[in-house]
């Protein structure tokens, strides 16, 4: 790694995950955004061998370090990830969406994964859904990826899939009690927006509401330092929101998902998605450094808005 560090000057990496599981459940199995437990443990071995694990307070300081984060507040954060991090004495941040806490409702992407899972089980379901969507059965998957939550609910009724019952049975998200336990154990609890909506589709007022609502919950849970991670990344987000976050919104640091990148806002940091199951952490991180080096030659390694 020494060559990459010397060439780029980028000493800190920010790997992130959604969940860790050897038995992916239907609400995320079709999304491919998960890491097996073995891969995750191998990742941690790589990171701890080459970098120092640091707290959120040290994110942005250029030293050979890494900070882990996990998005969407999924239940495996408590049942799988939490014990591993405690055993290895590693710091991390959990970014949550308050709409899903205590399994009150389901994230649209998880609804779509469930629908896609059901498609595999029944040709009758495929026919019903293709009729509803007015598309060929072979095009159902691409159509489903474009629907909103209300459409997903309507389609679920067609094939007798009950999202509310699934939430009760499987409890896919963290509970308030679990979040407070994580916080009391020394982990950072961060803001991932109220409902995981894509911020580049929202008005400025809607964006602020998504952030402020979660900030209020975090303060009730005793969280003093506020950090925000954009759902779906920060593509096409206007400078106006960044200025508001830092000056009025109480956000100390914010995060995107663009990999190893520089940013025009020094308090905004980019993370590296680790959920590429066929690749090791070393392969993923080296590829990020190589891509950064290529972009720097073209003067495109810094995000400008």
Locations of the language-model features?
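C-terminal active-site subregion of NodB/CE4 polysaccharide deacetylases
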Residues: 2-69, 107, 113-115, 201-305
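Short amphipathic alpha-helices and their capping/turn segments at secondary-structure boundaries
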Residues: 2-7, 82-87, 173-184
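Membrane-embedded segments
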Residues: 69, 73-81
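A short alpha/beta connector and helix-capping loop motif
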Residues: 80-98
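Glycine-enriched alpha-helix->loop->beta-strand junction motifs that scaffold or abut catalytic
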Residues: 88-90, 185-189, 247-253
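Extended, charge-rich helix/loop segments that form flexible
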Residues: 104-185
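Alpha-helical scaffold elements lining the catalytic groove of polysaccharide deacetylases
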Residues: 170-188, 195-221
């Amino acid at each position: 790694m020494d060559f990459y560090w010397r060439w780029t000057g980028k000493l800190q990496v920010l790997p992130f995950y959604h969940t860790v599981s050897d038995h992916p459940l239907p609400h995320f199995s079709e999304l491919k955004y998960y890491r097996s437990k073995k891969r995750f443990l191998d990742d941690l071995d790589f990171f701890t061998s080459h970098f120092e694990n640091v707290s959120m307070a040290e994110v942005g300081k250029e030293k050979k370090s890494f900070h882990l984060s996990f998005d969407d507040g999924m239940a495996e954060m408590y049942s799988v990830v939490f014990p591993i991090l405690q055993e290895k004495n590693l710091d991390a941040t959990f970014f949550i969406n308050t709409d899903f806490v205590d399994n009150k409702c389901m994230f649209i992407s998880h609804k779509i994964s469930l629908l896609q899972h059901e498609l595999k089980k029944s040709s009758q379901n495929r026919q019903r859904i293709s009729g509803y969507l007015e598309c060929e059965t072979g095009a159902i998957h691409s159509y489903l990826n474009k629907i909103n939550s209300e459409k997903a609910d309507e389609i679920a009724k067609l094939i007798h899939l009950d999202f509310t019952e699934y939430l009760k049975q499987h409890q896919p998200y963290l509970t308030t009690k679990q979040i407070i336990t994580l916080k009391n154990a020394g982990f950072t609890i961060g803001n991932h927006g109220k409902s995981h909506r894509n911020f580049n589709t929202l008005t400025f007022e809607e964006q602020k509401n998504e952030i402020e609502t979660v900030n209020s919950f975090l303060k009730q849970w005793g969280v003093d330092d506020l950090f925000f991670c954009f759902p779906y990344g920060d593509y096409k987000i206007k400078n106006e929101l960044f200025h508001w976050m830092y000056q009025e919104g109480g956000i100390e640091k914010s995060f995107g998902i663009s990999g190893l990148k520089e940013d025009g806002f020094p308090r905004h940091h980019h993370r590296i998605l680790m959920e590429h199951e066929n690749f090791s952490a070393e392969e993923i991180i080296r590829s990020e450094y190589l891509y950064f080096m290529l972009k720097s030659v073209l003067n495109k390694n810094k995000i400008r808005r």
